[in-house]
């Protein structure tokens, strides 16, 4: 029998936080208040933490004390990756998982009527992220001490958690099951037999031994040994060498896809799909849209044939309403449905993330409606969608919004605002002054020279690309080592630029949006904001407070706003900064603390990825000249580099190396 009563979910695991630090400053009161409110049943709270006050550490303390499965949502993959790394360090003994979109590249299916262009869905799936997604869903069904760090893709349709759990194959030594029955069960849950290329989501057979590689792992697999029609023993093995790592008393294998359905449901789904197709064809024909009628019939019949034969088809998610047995308009199952009822949600940088959650649904519907109107998809495809904001809210049992500048939405949800203003380093919010725009270039140059003489760095933020480029050229002419960071720069390059700034390869960084993640540089003692009085996204109260915060990592932090008038946003930002600074100074005086610039080691993933890229480039030269043995060695070396890159969450590099491994394998 498969699944159902076989998953023994551990309910009594405890979160165990490992850190050399103790809560300090106003962290203890923030932690205490948040925990008391959660235990007291409060639904929503805001942790309003200034930049550099250790919000992630506070979140970790809260998770440990509340001891509930927790979903942490960030507004992009890079930020999610940083948080995932931090939480993994804080909770080495618990399940810290990572759930983001598994597409390295994604071109959604679309239709442009004006040019009669149909764009087929095109994507490349990142195998490493797919593994981590499977690891997240299986952990949620197996234990209670789980933290999932996710991007907003966690509100997209995922498939039924009940079907996923019920389809799981449960194996124990002494269990009566024939080898062939196990093989059939594995194929049913979308595992693929491959006796040569043994990797994630595959199994191989050697006589009475079946070796299985779960979809949620990438290093160790399992060996199931049979004696007749009974399992003799189950071992964990090293997938590359086959070395036995020890016996296992119970093995649960979750499906290799999140979109699972059983035979009975499949038949019902196919019946409903065909009925919907006939209705749609009749409607098109009645409107004289014969091309659309033929298109939808041809397409649907092909997909249904694939579902009958293979149990799967490309774009199966578009039929998820029928697969899940949902009614029209009902929300899809998402990662949130894999959590138990009583779980905690933390929204990082909530002023950005909540806006994303709100906007996802409308953009998705506009694109899909075009596909339905022109016969590329059935109307039920509209129900393969992200959650609406109110549907997301219905999943919320308890939530903490985390931001230095909470948005209007969060403030409407709750009046409980927990402040965290004191930095463990004693650092103060920077002093802010306003200077006129007349002669600003010369004034700025003088300030830059004063900083660079002391070995400090400068951030300058402009409003337009042209101004950023002109200013860069001017400063270069004046002998300043300067770089302009524009929006087209990739994450990896951005990390490299920040590293060079910290190392002193250049002294001044100019950009339009310096609020991007990872741009925290302790060496920056001056932030100059040009056109501070031009109201807008980066010059509103929140944008200004966040930008001012970029100078709060240095004990000499200073901010100059160049403007001809003081706008309401500027005044509010200055008032808030002054309020915090006063509280911080009073705390430092009372406790005899002298502010210390953060000493942050200049080491990040770029150092390792650069080495790997150099090694990879070196290796590519002689591939074709290698003999078989040398190629095998090269494959092992590359796979090691691939795992290192993946562990550092540099999935782009990991994917490049994986492609090279596949190329090498194809030569044999």
From Swiss-Prot:
Protein name per Swiss-Prot or TrEMBL: UvrABC system protein B
Annotated function: The UvrABC repair system catalyzes the recognition and processing of DNA lesions. A damage recognition complex composed of 2 UvrA and 2 UvrB subunits scans DNA for abnormalities. Upon binding of the UvrA(2)B(2) complex to a putative damaged site, the DNA wraps around one UvrB monomer. DNA wrap is dependent on ATP binding by UvrB and probably causes local melting of the DNA helix, facilitating insertion of UvrB beta-hairpin between the DNA strands. Then UvrB probes one DNA strand for the presence of a lesion.
NCBIfam families hit by this protein: PRK05298.1, uvrb
Residue span, UVR domain: 632-667
Single GO term (MF): DNA binding
GO cellular component: a single term: cytoplasm
Any one of the GO BP annotations: SOS response
Family under the similarity heading: Belongs to the UvrB family.
Database matches in Pfam families: Helicase_C, ResIII, UVR, UvrB, UvrB_inter
Highest rank taxon of the organism: Bacteria
Start and end residues of each Helicase C-terminal domain: 440-606
Motif annotated as Beta-hairpin, chain positions: 102-125
Localization terms from the record: Cytoplasm
Keywords annotated in UniProt: ATP-binding, Cytoplasm, DNA damage, DNA excision, DNA repair, Excision nuclease, Nucleotide-binding, SOS response
Residues that, per the record, bind ATP: 49-56
Helicase ATP-binding domain sequence ranges: 36-423
InterPro entries (alphabetical): Helicase/UvrB_N, Helicase_ATP-bd, Helicase_C-like, P-loop_NTPase, UVR_dom, UVR_dom_sf, UvrB, UvrB_inter
Summary of subunit composition and partner proteins: Forms a heterotetramer with UvrA during the search for lesions. Interacts with UvrC in an incision complex.
Chief location category: cytoplasm
Recorded domain comment: The beta-hairpin motif is involved in DNA binding.
Gene3D superfamilies hit by this protein: P-loop containing nucleotide triphosphate hydrolases, UVR domain
């Amino acid at each position: 029998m498969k699944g159902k009563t076989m998953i023994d979910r551990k309910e009594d695991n405890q979160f165990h936080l490992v850190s050399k630090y103790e809560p300090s400053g106003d962290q203890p009161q923030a932690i205490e208040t948040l925990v008391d409110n959660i235990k007291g049943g409060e639904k929503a709270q805001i942790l309003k933490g200034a930049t550099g006050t250790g919000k992630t550490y506070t979140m970790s303390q809260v998770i440990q004390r509340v001891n509930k499965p927790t979903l942490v949502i960030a507004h992009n993959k890079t930020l999610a990756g940083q948080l995932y790394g931090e939480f993994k360090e804080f909770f080495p003994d618990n399940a810290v998982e990572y759930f983001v979109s598994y597409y390295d590249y994604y071109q959604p299916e679309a239709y442009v009527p004006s040019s009669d262009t149909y764009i087929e869905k095109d994507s490349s799936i990142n195998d490493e992220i797919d593994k981590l997604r499977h690891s997240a869903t299986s952990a949620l069904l197996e234990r209670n001490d789980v933290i999932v760090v996710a991007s907003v893709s966690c509100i997209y349709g995922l498939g039924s958690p009940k079907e996923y759990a019920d389809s799981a194959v449960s194996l124990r030594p002494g269990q009566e099951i024939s080898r062939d029955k196990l093989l059939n069960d594995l194929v049913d849950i979308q595992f693929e037999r491959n006796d040569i290329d043994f990797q994630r989501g595959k199994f191989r057979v050697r006589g009475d031994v079946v070796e299985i590689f779960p979809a949620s792992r990438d290093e160790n697999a399992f060996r199931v040994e049979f004696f007749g029609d009974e399992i003799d023993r189950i071992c964990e093995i090293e997938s590359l060498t086959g070395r036995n790592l020890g016996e296992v008393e119970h093995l649960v294998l979750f499906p290799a896809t999140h979109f699972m359905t059983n035979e009975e449901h499949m038949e019902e789904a196919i019946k409903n799909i065909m009925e919907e197709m006939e209705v749609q064809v009749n409607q098109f024909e009645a409107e004289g849209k014969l091309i659309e009628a033929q298109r939808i019939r041809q397409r649907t019949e092909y997909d249904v044939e694939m579902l009958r034969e293979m149990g799967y088809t490309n774009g199966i998610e578009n039929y998820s309403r029928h697969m899940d047995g949902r009614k029209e308009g009902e929300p899809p199952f998402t990662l949130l449905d894999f959590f138990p009822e009583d779980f905690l949600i933390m929204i990082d940088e909530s002023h950005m993330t909540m806006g994303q959650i709100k906007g996802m649904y409308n953009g998705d519907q506009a694109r899909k409606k075009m596909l339905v109107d022109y016969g590329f998809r059935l109307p039920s495809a509209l129900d393969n969608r992200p959650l609406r904001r109110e549907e997301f809210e219905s999943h919320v049992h308890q939530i903490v919004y985390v931001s230095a500048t909470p948005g209007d939405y969060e403030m409407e949800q709750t009046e409980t605002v927990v402040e965290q203003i004191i930095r463990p380093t004693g650092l103060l919010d920077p002093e802010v002054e306003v200077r006129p725009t007349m002669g600003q270039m010369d004034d700025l140059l003088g300030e830059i020279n004063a900083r660079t003489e002391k070995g400090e760095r400068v951030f300058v933020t402009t409003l337009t690309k042209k101004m950023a480029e002109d200013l860069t050229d001017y400063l270069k002419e004046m002998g300043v080592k300067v770089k302009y960071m524009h929006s087209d720069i990739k994450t990896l390059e951005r990390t490299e630029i920040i590293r060079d700034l910290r190392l002193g390869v250049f002294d001044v960084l100019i950009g339009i949006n310096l609020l991007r993640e990872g741009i925290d540089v302790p060496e920056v003692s001056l932030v100059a904001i040009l056109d501070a009085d031009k109201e807008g996204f980066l010059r509103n109260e929140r944008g200004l407070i966040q930008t001012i915060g970029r100078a709060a990592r240095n004990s000499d932090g200073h901010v100059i706003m160049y403007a001809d008038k003081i706008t309401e946003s500027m005044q509010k930002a200055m008032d808030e900064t002054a309020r915090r600074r006063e509280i911080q100074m009073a705390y430092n005086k009372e406790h005899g603390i002298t502010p210390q610039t953060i000493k942050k080691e200049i080491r990040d993933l770029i150092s390792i990825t650069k080495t790997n890229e150099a090694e990879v480039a070196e290796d590519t030269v002689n591939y074709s000249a290698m003999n078989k043995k040398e190629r095998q060695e090269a494959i092992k070396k590359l796979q090691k580099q691939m795992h290192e890159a993946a562990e550092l969450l540099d999935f782009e590099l990991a994917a490049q190396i994986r492609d090279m491994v596949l190329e090498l394998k194809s030569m044999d």
